[in-house]
Amino acid sequence: MEIRPWEESDRPFLRTLYLHARREGWPWLDASEWRLEDFDADTLGETILVAQEDGHRLGFASIAENDNFLHHLFVAPDAQGRGVGAALLEAVQARFTSTGALKCMEKNTRALRFYARHGWVEEGHGDAPEGTYVLLHFRKP
């Protein structure tokens, strides 16, 4: 598996994955207004890494590098459970220059378990229009 910087040719796949993964992963939210173009606005100015294997895109992560903040990490449903998320997370963590941070919706228990398995620790909670989120930190060894 290769983790590489995104290219413009990745945009259709990333848009589709972002839309569908949010609909599947966040069923408690109203997705009726979500569009493919949301990916463009929601990752503007971020570093995007793509997981790829044998020419097939499997997932992506987007990072606000100046803040050491993991904004998004999504894996295609047919690629889940194969280490894609872990590989993306490892690549993201390697880019952090200090303590990394992310916010995960409290209802997204699957993602919270994933991050905990990879050494992320809960630092607090906050409220967002989508609901309560958990603030997680990753301290570089």
Region spans (language model):
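Conserved N-terminal entry element of GNAT/NAT acetyltransferase domains
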Residues: M1-S9, K140-P141
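Short glycine/proline-centered loop/turn elements that form peptide/ligand docking sites
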Residues: G85, L89, K107-A111, A128-V134
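Acetyl-CoA-dependent GNAT
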Residues: P5-D78, L89-A91, R95, G126-A128
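Active-site beta-strand termini and strand-to-loop segments that position acidic
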Residues: Q52-D54, F138-P141
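Active-site acidic-Proline motif in GNAT/NAT acetyltransferases
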Residues: A76-R82, E106-K107
